Amino acid sequence: MVVILTAAVTLLLPAPILGAPAQSAPKTVVIDPGHGGGDTGVKGTGGTLEKDVTLRLARLIENRLQGRYRVLLTRNDDYIMPGPDRTGQANHNNADLLISLHTAGSYSPTANDLQVYYYTEAEIRNPDTAASGESKATPWRKVQKPHIPASSILAQRIWERAKGLYANNPGGVVPAPAAVLAGADMPAVLIESGYLTNPKQEKNLNDNKYLFKLASAISQGIDDYFNNPETITSTDLRE
């Protein structure tokens, strides 16, 4: 941890105009492109790497959200970043949302759906969503607990917008002990945006037009969450 000390500076500012409406600060959205550097993530049959897809998608989402929100990326280039550092960036910047981006892999070359995860402490077999022993041992994982209801709503909003791109098998909203979500002190979700091990889906995830549509859908889901953060019932979620 780096502590930065800043000297106090007194500024002479004009007196505020009485009656002028206060301007609220824009919401902060942190986009986390999964993997990076030597941690390549899933590799598609055509050689596409998860780390590259997630970074391209993150930049497109950033572009779609700018102007309405303060948008930060946990990484802006191809380098390794530990999971706790990703969550730490969101916490340090007092983010209102954390969106972690991934792609999936499967032994089945026809697997093709969209999974949007929110945090739970239940076990699940998935390298992107399984919490590490270190994260399970730290009390920081407890900070996500109060945000789980809101995280599930955020996941539902995003999935509702993006599922049309996966018409034959739209997937769903799933609880999982995702390590990157465990210590997030704000609503947070992890998006598995398709299977690179499916040649057709790999082609889609290399297509800029397709990625733009996906980025737009995710951005609309974020807008929907901020505009309508009402509670949804458990029957709306795939357990």
How does the language model describe each region?
Residues 2-14:
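Bacterial N-terminal signal peptides
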Residues 26, 55-239:
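Active-site-proximal helix/loop segments of hydrolytic enzymes
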Residues 13-15, 32, 186:
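Hydrophobic alpha-helix-in-membranes signature
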Residues 27-47:
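Short glycine-rich His-centered loop
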Residues 44-49, 204-208:
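Short glycine-enriched, charge-decorated loop/helix-capping segments at active-site entrances
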Residues 32, 39, 50, 100-102, ...:
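Acidic active-site catalytic centers that drive phospho-/nucleotidyl reactions
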